[in-house]
């Protein structure tokens, strides 16, 4: 037998052995327990829109389905608002969303003003961290829920701490709880296609002289299991005269397993109204030269449409036909691969690391 014939025989024997073991694994653990990556029905990760076009671009399409997402930041930075917009987007597409309100602070009136269908939103206000995470696990395993939001990790108080007295030290109990929960639910999340968003608070590490003293609550498990981590900050207060009407938020993609990380997105959050979608559109329209800015004036097709950013946003909201036309043109240019800075601010476009080509990422959901 020649060397070539020997190799062919060995290859056939290996293929036969592989087929046998794959069949045995599927009989023991069920269909789909092991597969070739090329046989997967969904090679591309589907996404849920964040409600902000600039953030969708920074994330590579939006929140990935079937993954864990962590959103953290200081108080009043827009964390809950960001997730309520995601819930509204899921419901708009006929999906089911759940909100686990561990902080007992959900405002249904505000949620409704952001477009959330509060009548059909599943809400739980658990008494303990164990109860909250068990509810999350059961919702995921049902495969009937598309999005679960947990607000927040810091409020997931272990039962031992609740049943104890004030001043009792239960060291590491919350970290152990989160570590066990992440081990348990991560596999179910991938199988069900449900996206789970954990909101988290910031704390300061004591005695840190060099480096960043900030850290998130709940230990390190969530940092490892999360496919996407978003750091949201309030960078500016929006004012008309002395009246404050919103904030400018900056989101850094601190971790992303499904698209390039470290991109930055900025957008306006208006009090009582949520993310300014028209503001995001104007930022991108300006960068793609669909709307031209000269000094304080913005012009479209050679005609001035507003003096100042706020007046231009109001004009676009009042002229929906032109707004929709501008939106279509922006999306067309982005699909063609027009480059925009990930934070949609020309002043920061001087850093090439902030620049992304939209045809290199998934289509915005």
From Swiss-Prot:
<dbReference type="InterPro" id="IPR020587">
    <property type="entry name" value="RecA_monomer-monomer_interface"/>
</dbReference>
<dbReference type="GO" id="GO:0003697">
    <property type="term" value="F:single-stranded DNA binding"/>
</dbReference>
<dbReference type="InterPro" id="IPR003593">
    <property type="entry name" value="AAA+_ATPase"/>
</dbReference>
<dbReference type="InterPro" id="IPR020584">
    <property type="entry name" value="DNA_recomb/repair_RecA_CS"/>
</dbReference>
<dbReference type="GO" id="GO:0005829">
    <property type="term" value="C:cytosol"/>
</dbReference>
<dbReference type="GO" id="GO:0140664">
    <property type="term" value="F:ATP-dependent DNA damage sensor activity"/>
</dbReference>
<keyword id="KW-0227">DNA damage</keyword>
<keyword id="KW-0547">Nucleotide-binding</keyword>
<comment type="similarity">
    <text>Belongs to the RecA family.</text>
</comment>
<dbReference type="GO" id="GO:0005524">
    <property type="term" value="F:ATP binding"/>
</dbReference>
<keyword id="KW-0238">DNA-binding</keyword>
<dbReference type="GO" id="GO:0009432">
    <property type="term" value="P:SOS response"/>
</dbReference>
<dbReference type="InterPro" id="IPR013765">
    <property type="entry name" value="DNA_recomb/repair_RecA"/>
</dbReference>
<dbReference type="Pfam" id="PF21096">
    <property type="entry name" value="RecA_C"/>
</dbReference>
<dbReference type="GO" id="GO:0003684">
    <property type="term" value="F:damaged DNA binding"/>
</dbReference>
<dbReference type="GO" id="GO:0006310">
    <property type="term" value="P:DNA recombination"/>
</dbReference>
<dbReference type="InterPro" id="IPR049428">
    <property type="entry name" value="RecA-like_N"/>
</dbReference>
<dbReference type="InterPro" id="IPR049261">
    <property type="entry name" value="RecA-like_C"/>
</dbReference>
<dbReference type="GO" id="GO:0006281">
    <property type="term" value="P:DNA repair"/>
</dbReference>
<dbReference type="GO" id="GO:0016887">
    <property type="term" value="F:ATP hydrolysis activity"/>
</dbReference>
<dbReference type="Pfam" id="PF00154">
    <property type="entry name" value="RecA"/>
</dbReference>
<dbReference type="InterPro" id="IPR020588">
    <property type="entry name" value="RecA_ATP-bd"/>
</dbReference>
<keyword id="KW-0963">Cytoplasm</keyword>
<keyword id="KW-0234">DNA repair</keyword>
<keyword id="KW-0742">SOS response</keyword>
<feature type="binding site">
    <location>
        <begin position="73"/>
        <end position="80"/>
    </location>
    <ligand>
        <name>ATP</name>
    </ligand>
</feature>
<keyword id="KW-0067">ATP-binding</keyword>
<keyword id="KW-0233">DNA recombination</keyword>
<dbReference type="InterPro" id="IPR027417">
    <property type="entry name" value="P-loop_NTPase"/>
</dbReference>
<dbReference type="InterPro" id="IPR023400">
    <property type="entry name" value="RecA_C_sf"/>
</dbReference>
<protein>
    <recommendedName>
        <fullName>Protein RecA</fullName>
    </recommendedName>
</protein>
<comment type="function">
    <text>Can catalyze the hydrolysis of ATP in the presence of single-stranded DNA, the ATP-dependent uptake of single-stranded DNA by duplex DNA, and the ATP-dependent hybridization of homologous single-stranded DNAs. It interacts with LexA causing its activation and leading to its autocatalytic cleavage.</text>
</comment>
